[in-house]
Amino acid sequence: MYPTDPRQLNTERQIYLDKQFFVDVFSIPACVRNTNGDLSATNEKFSKEFIGSLDIKEWFYSLPVQVATSFLREELDAMSLPSSMNKIQSVAIGDKLWLVQFIPLIYGEVVNVLWLFFCKNSNVIVDYCRGLRTNITNDRMLEFKNKSTEIQWKVFILYSFGFCHESIASLLSITNGSSRNAISEVYKFFGIHSKHDLLMIFHTSRMHSLFFDELFFILKCAE
């Protein structure tokens, strides 16, 4: 049922758009679940990887009971302890292994949870990734923010949220080459060699509030 107060309708529409925006910017499977347990937003990668011919409402219930239970436990922890780091290191869905992260999205009194799926069936060694997440601290991330130029930091934020170099160049009024050079400096600073490594650092840094605020500021300035 639609709200009778137009202002409430606008607020609910904005919340929906915000959630859809969050999942659309990711280049990995991502979804948002609300407090009713419904998938309120999914991106194309998620639909292609997990939904297929399924009814989207049935996806969660199609998972093995043990997997669904572990997902639900982490999701509830994310809702009740927004500052905690909630993730499942390795879970099989279909024929692939995934690292799944649960990030609370808070809209006033309403808490939804963003789910991010990192495929572990790649050429990345699990132990290396675990060490990478451990070694990149919040202080190191802030050190990069303080040492980088304004453009380097903005490119880092946009690229990590899934924007391609062409889009970044257009948003920031720079060349594609400048965007690529900025990412090369990011790799050099953190001692990494691939976008997968960068995403692991980005999404396990526990600094999502800062990153989301920075993203909205960048996009607002580009309007």
Curated annotation (Swiss-Prot):
Keywords: Activator, Conjugation, Cytoplasm, Plasmid, Transcription, Transcription regulation. It is found in: Cytoplasm. One of its GO terms (cellular component) is cytoplasm. This protein is essential for positively regulating the expression of transfer genes that are involved in the conjugal transfer of DNA between bacterial cells. Its main location: cytoplasm. It comes from the Bacteria. It comes from Escherichia coli. This is Protein TraJ. The keyword Transmembrane helix does not apply.
